[in-house]
Amino acid sequence: MKYYLIAGEASGDLHASHLIAALKERDPEAVFRCYGGDMMQAQGAQLVGHYRDMAYMGIWPVLLHARTILRKMSECKRDILHWQPDVVVLVDYPGFNLKIARYVKSHTRIPVYYYIAPKIWAWKEHRIRAIRRDVDELFSILPFEVEFFEGKHHYPIHYVGNPTVDEVAAHRPTSATWQKPVIALLPGSRVQEIRGNLHRMLEAAAPFVRDYQLIVAQAPGQPDTVYMPIIEDCRRRFFPDVLMPVGLQSGGTFDLLSHAAAALVTSGTATLETALFRVPQVVCYYMKAGWLATLGRRLILKIPYISLVNLVAGREVVPELVADGMTPSRVRRHLSSILPGGEARQGQLDGYEEVARRLGSPGAPQRAAALMLELLRGAPLQS
């Protein structure tokens, strides 16, 4: 069969690459074409557009790059129409992907599958109408989404488990190369996130550099030039007398997390990855006009937490410092409490065990691939 996949950011590229691998195992004749990233391409998909050209967030960045985004969307629509796949598989990234779903349903008879459901339980709940109209099958990776979609909106979905469980379980760490214990800094995957978060993370962690090595996770596709000016500025300002206080780690976050004593993490999939590696963390996310962003969050978001760790647990397991709550002094205070010997460390580790139980066993990409093929072939679904 011919599969057309669309992923709009680094985490979607990772999850989609594992789904492609699982589909290839079950469909020897599978051919893949995608808008995505390097990992999808490495699995054999023909990459016709990279997510780097579409990964903008926030009102102003999106408006400033609206022409680019619209051009990429038009190219994607034309490519689907020309290639005529057997199925279009959308991976997260709802602002772009739901528009693609509308186009596919309006202009073709190609089925639309959605892997990693849009997070409409957080905001833009009205999108359920578009999902109901334009998405044939929805594959969820978060256990609490079943009650939201099926219980509240009477829209049937497939919970297949969480692929992050598989990815962490499959990782084999390399030998540590650092002389001191590590504090991992994960400032995000987009340029705007990195520029907003990294400086504040480094300032918060500065008092610990004599006992810990600070290692920044370099997001896939982001060059050194995004990070090094910030790192060098902070080195001069906050720890000029410490030899090599900050390192930049490329090649993914898993090796870094497997050796970290604690972490500062932006929201998103990275918070779940950090929890599954059993690394205590502080979730911190800077926004411009912080007090206004905090007010907007309270008015718009329909959820009590922003991190997947807390949402899966149904309670606060990790602290969340967002918008005007993310100050270096607050981050520093929480970081101190989760380092070895800190009073909050064991409570987080206990909470992580609860999160792992709720997510379930490995096998999410394989279960999703098997379900997709059964649906496409018209075979009866296995219970």
Feature annotation, model-predicted:
Residues 1-383:
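Nucleotide-activated sugar donor-binding and catalytic core shared by glycosyltransferases
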